[in-house]
Amino acid sequence: MTVWVGLTGGIGSGKSAAAQCFADLGVPRIDADAAAHSLTASDGIALPEIRRLFGDTVFDTQGLLRRDILRKEVFASPSRKALLESVMLPLIFSEIKKQQETFTDAAYGIVEIPLLTEKRQFISLIRRVLTISAPVEKRIGRVMARSGLTRGEVAAVISHQASESERLLLADDVLLNDGSLKSLREKTMRLHAFYSGIFASKPTQGKHND
C-alpha cells in the first residue's frame, strides 16, 4: 500500500520544485493544482457549474474559461471565492483520490496541496504533512521573477494565505528552502531516505492518521 505525504507551503516557497525533486527520485507525485486545471480545461467537468454560477463573462467566445477574469472576481469577493470552492474542492478531492488508487507498489507518494492548511478536508487523503518553508523576502522575489507581479501584488496574495505559523503547526516535517536548487535536492534526498524507511516499517507513521 502506498502511503501519501501531503506537501504544502505558501506561494513562492518552492513547493513545485520540491515535489519535482521527489519525482526525480522515482516517488509518485500528484498535483492538486494540475487536477484543478484539468477540471477547468476545455470540456472539463467543472465548467457547466462554473458557467451557471458565474455567467458567460468568465468564458471566451470559444467556451474556454477565462482564468484571469475568474481569478480577479474571486480574489475581490470572499463570497464568490467560497462559491467557486464549493464547486472545485469536492471535484479536486475526488480526482486526487482517483489518482492515488492507481499507485499501489511505491512505499510512499507525494501529494502537492497548496491549500492544505486552509482546507483541512484534504488531510484525510494523507498520512503525513511536509511543509516547505522559506523567508518571506525570498518568496516575494521568486514570485516577482516568474510572474511579473509587483511586490505589492505578491504581498497581497501572501496576506490572503495561511500564515507560516499555521502551516508549521500542521506539519510533521519542515523543509527550509532558503538556498540553491542543489541544496533543495540534497534536502529532499535526505527526506526520501527517511520516508522510505519509516513507511516501509510503520506505514501509519505521522500525526494525520485515520
From Swiss-Prot:
CDD domains: DPCK
Superkingdom field: Bacteria
Keyword line: ATP-binding, Coenzyme A biosynthesis, Cytoplasm, Kinase, Nucleotide-binding, Transferase
GO cellular component, one term: cytoplasm
Segments forming domain DPCK: 4-202
EC number per UniProt: 2.7.1.24
Catalytic activity: 3'-dephospho-CoA + ATP = ADP + CoA + H(+)
Places the protein is found: Cytoplasm
Gene3D superfamilies: P-loop containing nucleotide triphosphate hydrolases
Major site of localization recorded for this protein: cytoplasm
GO terms, biological process: coenzyme A biosynthetic process
Protein role: Catalyzes the phosphorylation of the 3'-hydroxyl group of dephosphocoenzyme A to form coenzyme A.
HAMAP family: Dephospho_CoA_kinase (MF_00376)
Similarity section: Belongs to the CoaE family.
UniProt-recorded name of the protein: Dephospho-CoA kinase
Organism (species): Neisseria meningitidis serogroup B (strain ATCC BAA-335 / MC58)
Record lineage: Bacteria, Pseudomonadati, Pseudomonadota, Betaproteobacteria, Neisseriales
